[in-house]
Design a protein with these regions (language model features):
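Transmembrane helical elements of multi-pass membrane transporters/channels
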Residues: 21-40, 177, 209-213, 217, ...
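Short runs within selected transmembrane alpha-helices of multi-pass transporters and secretion channels
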Residues: 74, 143-162, 170-178, 202-218, ...
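Transmembrane alpha-helix boundary and packing residues in multipass membrane permease domains
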Residues: 26, 30, 42, 79, ...
Length: 461
């Protein structure tokens, strides 16, 4: 797509069409990303070994901690680039692009080193037992220690491409990696590797897929750099200004904090559920995979909407910006309600993707727990979307303070305390219902923060 078409997308295209143009590829890539992460659990579940499932689930929070790094550099840099485009400063944005790219490289390498040094203690804190430690360590070694730089930099590249209007190309890279992983998983797990090494095989397949996605997105970013505000050239890195770094961090840090806080919440959830038993832990691991589907749609829609809101915020077109916010909110709520209906009606069948519905013994009990947890937790979907929607709108307009306040209150003051209280009162079911209860309360805060920001006309200059 040429530059003049990008201007049409941001300035004159009907708002609904513009949102869909930016969001649909993003949603697709988010869903494929979820599916290929689910694929590991699906194929591991085919082994009939609940300890392997629990081991992979325990490694998930360690992997998800890579998301804050991607958000720091990707959303922080991408949001700033969109605002600079709206202000007519596209050429100056190349230094922001380069700073985001190399910042991601540096931070991801540091994270990989830290996990390499402290993997076993971290996994024990997460709830790994003697039965699950081996599998958790195998998955963490390949997917996190070796894979983090490729995952993080790919995420940043996709954010940068999306925020300059190249949403389809950004999604193609991430989606391609996901599809490849789904193809490699069964090949590695059941053909190339011996029985008992299924978790290791799945992890290696994921690593290879992430490397290929990284190579594709890097090639795309280099190719579009001559006709866009994007660049990964070291020469442009030299031109970055301290003010630009500050602006990246003002939005990027709150964006990084939220998934990091969710990781803390997942640690609390896993540790609390592990007290109730390995089967309950395995069941919750399946549910947290499935509930990422409505999350992926909500996040994809919000991320697709972000550059449109950011561009028109900076250009001063408040009417178009507000229209994008309203229409994006309606789309997300309708989708979330549809997900609730799907999960409530087909909970057992969806859980059965990971475990044989005709199984007996431990597998059957795990399935029963998972179906029950899923029906309880899916009620959070519309409230989760409202939280994501408001947060991404604030990020688009550069309100890092509001985003940070919301993130801390949502997780540390509302969700985690509710989790601990409800666990003490209702046990494992209390842990399940803590998510919809927490998201419901957080949504009120999110909407209030967004409306408060929009009532400041001086901020829209």
């Amino acid at each position: 797509m040429k530059t003049d078409n990008k201007k049409e997308l941001f300035e004159t295209m009907p708002v609904t069409k513009a949102i869909l143009t930016l969001a649909v590829p993003t949603i697709i890539s988010q869903l494929i990303n979820v599916i290929y992460n689910i694929a590991d659990t699906f194929y591991v579940g085919r082994t009939g070994n609940p300890y392997m499932i629990a081991g992979v689930s325990l490694a998930l929070p360690v992997f998800l901690m890579t998301l804050p790094i991607g958000n720091l550099c990707g959303i922080g840099g991408g949001s700033l680039i969109s605002r600079m485009m709206g202000a007519g400063k596209g050429k100056e944005a190349k230094s922001v692009s380069a700073a985001s790219f190399y910042g991601a490289v540096l931070l991801s390498l540091i994270y990989s080193l830290l996990i390499f040094l402290f993997m076993n203690p971290i996994l024990r804190v997460l709830g790994a037992s003697a039965d699950t430690m081996e599998f958790s360590a195998q998955y963490t070694t390949y997917v996190v220690i070796w894979g983090t730089p490729f995952v993080v930099v790919s995420a940043v590249e996709s954010h940068l491409l999306r925020n300059t209007g190249y949403s389809a190309l950004a999604s193609a890279g991430l989606s391609g990696g996901g599809v490849l992983n789904m193809l490699l998983d069964p090949l590695f797990m059941f053909v190339l590797f011996p029985k008992g090494q299924e978790v290791k095989a799945a992890a290696i397949a994921t690593l290879i897929s992430n490397i290929i996605a990284f190579l594709f997105l890097t090639m795309v970013l280099i190719r579009v750099s001559n006709r866009s505000p994007l660049s990964i050239a070291p020469a442009d890195l030299k031109n970055v200004k301290k003010k630009q770094i500050s602006q990246i961090c003002s939005v990027g840090i709150p964006s990084a904090v939220l998934p990091g806080l969710f990781d803390v919440a997942n640690i609390v959830l896993n540790s609390s559920m592990a007290v109730h038993g390995d089967l309950q832990l395995a069941a919750m691991g399946i549910v947290t995979k499935l509930e990422r589907i409505p999350n992926a749609v909500g996040i994809g829609l919000s991320q697709g909407m972000l550059p449109l809101v950011a561009y028109n915020f900076s250009s001063g077109n408040r009417e178009r910006m507000n229209s994008a916010i309203r229409k994006g909110r309606r789309m997300g709520i309708v989708t979330a309600v549809c997900c609730i209906i799907l999960f409530e009606v087909f909970a057992k069948q969806l859980v059965g993707i990971f475990l044989d519905t005709k199984a007996a013994g431990e597998a059957a009990l795990t399935l029963t727990f998972a179906a029950s947890f899923l029906r309880m937790r899916c009620a959070a979907s519309p409230f989760q979307f409202l939280n994501y929607h408001s947060s991404y709108c604030l990020q688009a307009m550069g309100d890092g303070k509001g985003t940070l306040i919301h993130a801390f209150c949502r997780i540390l003051l509302i969700y985690i305390p509710l989790m601990l209280i409800l666990d003490r009162i209702f046990g494992q079911n209390g842990l399940a219902v803590s998510l919809p209860a927490g998201e419901f309360l957080s949504a009120f805060l999110a909407i209030w923060l967004l409306r408060r920001w929009l009532k400041k006309p001086h901020e829209l200059k």
